[in-house]
């Protein structure tokens, strides 16, 4: 048995009873071990492509305009030639499928521009209006510069998108591991950044999949503000693997700290 996307755990087993204690032991070993991450201060701000102001044109988000975006930029990368970008872009749908992040019955749409290739994922429709819906991936972009970005819907209910202090780190960690599982970025050091488009309608609250909220505190409503992290460090590639949870916690706390409700 092997975790193909990360290579973290590898062992053999005969029965489920034989496997379970090995998995539990490996989890305890990883939790008690040293952090796999190593950080280094950046000499200058990274040149990131943000999509916060682009809106959702071309994406099937079922009317949702507030999206979480996560960017991974490899350091010391020459980027891609037009031929390399096209080749990798054509492989993106297959790479997305292999990760298991998107169900096989959900269609994927590919698109391209001068500077990037993209794959979009249609949002799952809720059973009825106002039904709570968890966060979900809606787009993957690969830029000519080497940057790999994902956009996803935040958890939301009838009162709007939610920045849940517990759910947000888990969603970001999932996107980080998904990015690593695409097996595109292999450089030793990367820069990470996260942001939320149209954040005025978001609220810091607890997401409950079983029931929608009846009230929400929209401290940012009617105000113009940006909700994004400003990276000043690079980190090792383990941030897309064993160190994803640790990095995601930092990014989530930074986003929430910048929200007007946190003031």
Q: Which sequence ranges carry the predicted segments?
A:
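Hydrophobic, Leu/Ile/Phe/Ala-enriched alpha-helical segments that form helix-helix packing faces
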Residues: 3-5, 27, 92, 96, ...
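Substrate-recognition/cap regions that form aromatic- and gly/pro-loop-enriched pockets
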Residues: 161-211
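Charge-rich interaction segments
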Residues: 16-150
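Alpha-helix boundary/N-cap detector
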Residues: 18, 80-83, 163-170, 235, ...
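Short glycine-rich, low-complexity/disordered patches
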Residues: 36-43, 104-108, 181-202, 257-263
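Short acidic, glycine/tyrosine-flanked loop/strand segments centered on an H-E-D-like triad
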Residues: 131-160, 214-231
């Amino acid at each position: 048995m092997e975790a193909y996307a990360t290579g973290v755990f590898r062992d053999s087993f005969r029965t489920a009873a034989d496997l379970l204690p090995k998995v539990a032991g490996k989890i305890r070993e990883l939790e008690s071990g040293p952090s796999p991450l190593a950080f280094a201060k950046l000499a200058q701000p990274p040149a990131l492509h943000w999509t916060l102001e682009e809106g959702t044109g071309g994406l099937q988000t079922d009317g949702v305009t507030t999206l979480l975006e996560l960017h991974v930029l490899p350091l010391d990368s020459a980027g891609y030639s037009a031929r390399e970008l096209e080749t990798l872009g054509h492989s993106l749908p297959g790479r997305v499928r292999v990760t298991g992040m998107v169900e096989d019955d959900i269609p994927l749409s590919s698109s391209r521009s001068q500077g990037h290739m993209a794959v979009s994922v249609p949002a799952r429709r809720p059973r009825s209006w106002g039904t709570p819906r968890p966060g979900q991936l809606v787009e993957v972009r690969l830029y000519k510069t080497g940057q790999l970005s994902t956009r996803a819907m935040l958890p939301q209910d009838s009162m709007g998108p939610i920045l849940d202090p517990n759910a947000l780190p888990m969603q970001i960690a999932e996107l980080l591991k998904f990015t690593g599982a695409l097996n595109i970025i292999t450089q030793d050091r990367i820069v990470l950044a996260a942001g939320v488009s149209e954040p005025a309608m978001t609220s810091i609250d607890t997401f409950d999949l079983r029931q929608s909220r009846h009230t929400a505190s929209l401290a940012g409503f009617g105000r113009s503000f940006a909700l994004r992290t400003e990276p000043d460090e690079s980190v090792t590639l383990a941030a897309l693997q064993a160190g994803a949870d640790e990095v995601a916690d930092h990014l989530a706390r930074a986003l929430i700290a910048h929200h007007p409700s946190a003031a």
